[in-house]
A protein has these predicted regions:
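Bacterial Sec-dependent N-terminal signal peptides
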Residues: 1-40
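Extended soluble regions of mature proteins
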Residues: 30-110, 114-230
Length: 230
């Protein structure tokens, strides 16, 4: 009887240790979940000059970004057109796909041409504030960006809870501050207020990084010189 009870105790101990080991593996897998592949959904608001405000209804209000490794792809769709921007951080590659019912163009941008396409920030100072709020489920810290020339200020919110590769919407911002969850950037004659609505980690469709057949290749200069009606 003694030997039988001792055998049972040892077996129970082994079962307990096995269960603890499996639980630890599960917790480690959750804690160290990869963040190099997934998607982000952004909400976009526009500030246009009075003479152009009538066009705001044609602009995309949502951007979906997929990221994997060194690559990102940003997709913005309106009622009549879609713009897809593919980037690769390692090679400084950027490709823009323009698609509508009447045209399909592909434009490759070198590093020097990219600023005009993705927008810029003027020379500015960045000051961290004490404000903290939750955006898309992540704790974000507030920063005030002040234009050195005009004195105009805008705010941006960054989180360090996660680490995500910059994409065409965020690459003008200082990545050392964290992942931007809400910010304003200037693009040509308009300003874009961008806010993250959702972040998801997991496999992304491989096809989103490819260029469909049938797109006509243009240079950035050819695109700029193209009449609007085309």
């Amino acid at each position: 009887m003694y030997l039988f009870r001792k055998f049972q105790q040892e077996r129970n101990m082994k079962n307990t240790l096995t269960a603890v080991f499996v639980l630890l593996l599960f917790l480690c897998a959750c804690k160290y979940k990869t963040t190099d592949e997934g998607s982000i959904i952004y909400h976009i608001e526009y500030q246009l000059p009075d003479s152009l405000k009538r066009y705001v209804k044609y602009l995309p209000k949502v951007a979906t970004v997929y990221f994997k490794g060194d690559s990102t792809v940003s997709i913005q769709k309106s009622n009549q057109e879609s713009t897809t921007i593919i980037t690769d951080k390692k090679t400084n590659f950027m490709r823009v796909l323009l698609n509508s019912a009447f045209r399909q163009y592909v434009v490759d941008y070198n590093k020097a041409d990219q600023a005009e396409e993705i927008g810029t920030l003027p020379p500015h100072t960045t000051t961290k504030q004490k404000d903290i709020k939750t955006i898309a489920g992540y704790q974000a810290a507030k920063y005030v960006l002040q234009d050195k020339l005009s004195g105009e200020t805008t705010e941006a919110w960054f989180t360090k809870d996660i680490s995500i590769l910059p994409n065409s919407l965020t690459m003008v911002l200082d990545s050392t501050l964290g992942v931007p969850l809400a910010f304003t950037i200037s693009q040509n004659v308009m300003k874009m207020k961008v806010t993250v609505q959702q972040v998801k980690f997991g496999p992304v469709p491989a096809a989103v990084f490819s260029t469909p057949k049938g797109y006509k290749l243009l240079t950035p200069q050819q695109l700029r010189e193209m009449p609007v009606q085309n």
